Amino acid sequence: MDRRVVITGLGGLCGLGTDASSIWTEMREGRSAIGPISNSEIHELKGMIGTEIKVLPQHDIDRKQLISMDRFSLLAVLAAKQAMLQAGLSCNEGNAHRFGATVGVGFGGWDATEKAYRTLLLGGATRTELFTGVKAMPSAAACQVSMNLGLRGPVFGATSACASANHAIASAVDQIKLGRADVMLAGGSDAPLVWIVLKAWEAMRVLAPDTCRPFSADRKGLVLGEGAGMAVLESYEHAAARGATMLAEVAGIGLSADAYHIAAPAVHGPEAAMRACLVDASLNAEDVDYLNAHGTGTKANDQIETTAIKRVFGDHARSMSISSTKSTHAHCLGAASALEMIACVMAIQEGVVPPTANYREPDPDCDLDVTPNVPRERKVRVAMSNAFAMGGMNAVLAFKQVP
């Protein structure tokens, strides 16, 4: 039996807000969180901008747990707890083996790694903190979510750069469809506002000096940010049996690889992933009302994504609404497509397409309707989310209203 998978809870933190509701409110209105980075340890950067979570929400995680967590893991746990709360779920001895988690992480614990470097090489110490190794591993986020919520089913991480969260969600859907779990926490987390990470991205010459302007002719690159987004996924039967509110259904998944270049984008991979997603969801191109674009704000990525969208959707590419919410929350790497999942689900819930903020000049090479600067009321029955990662790893998800 092909089990349907629905979303019953959302959680998130990023520069826009510290829960899914506040993130969506800011995103919907096109209010960008991009601004100066306040971390005093970050210096000598050409562009000192990003999206930071200024103050974390109150939580019940004690100090003994916190010392074993890098920031990206903490963000994942906080988002997961929010999602479980909205879903009205909790783990116990009777159901824990049917609850699991997959968390996408792009970079992982570079904060712990950089602190170890400073301690050993600059401070002259002979050893690092006890938990440096386990704090830094990308899978730590999934481990910490499991331990903090008591999940004993399938638990693992997904690491595919900017597509990590979509790959994690896709994998979680598979666990439910295969009957290995009834409930999965899925999403992504990253905390890349660390000096060594920012310097690495600066070296690639892709960071914008001012802000992120996806699809605008005067765009100058991407902006990095920290954040996490998590969803509670359930089999339709499990959610219906307990009378849960179903926010959306995960209708389809499309995965592909460019097999082309470690950094440069290509058209054929994104095109293949979008086509595969439509087939998996049994959708026609005309069924998609809203597409949340990968839309990083770099010259090459936005142009190539536009071309891929035109190839897949044909004439409908000019009828559906498109936007890049990275213009508001920036590129949160492993968390990016998790935050964009929130945008898709809430667009379906409220019938509003969030805009592409900071847009100034039309680009003839990006000539689709990217919903510039102002939200648009529109019935959204189906929303698609693109995630195209460095190295050509592509993951596309389709979400739809629950009948």
UniProtKB/Swiss-Prot annotation:
Entry EC number(s): 2.3.1.-
GO cellular component: plasma membrane
Family: Belongs to the thiolase-like superfamily. Beta-ketoacyl-ACP synthases family.
Name used for this protein in its record: Nodulation protein E
Function text: Proposed to synthesize NOD factor fatty acyl chain. Involved in the synthesis of a highly unsaturated fatty acid moiety, which forms part of a lipo-oligosaccharide that is responsible for host specificity.
Entry keyword Transferase: yes
Annotated GO biological process: fatty acid biosynthetic process
Main localization, broad class: membrane
Active site per UniProt: C162, H294, H331
Domain Ketosynthase family 3 (KS3): 2-401
Molecular function terms, GO-annotated: 3-oxoacyl-[acyl-carrier-protein] synthase activity
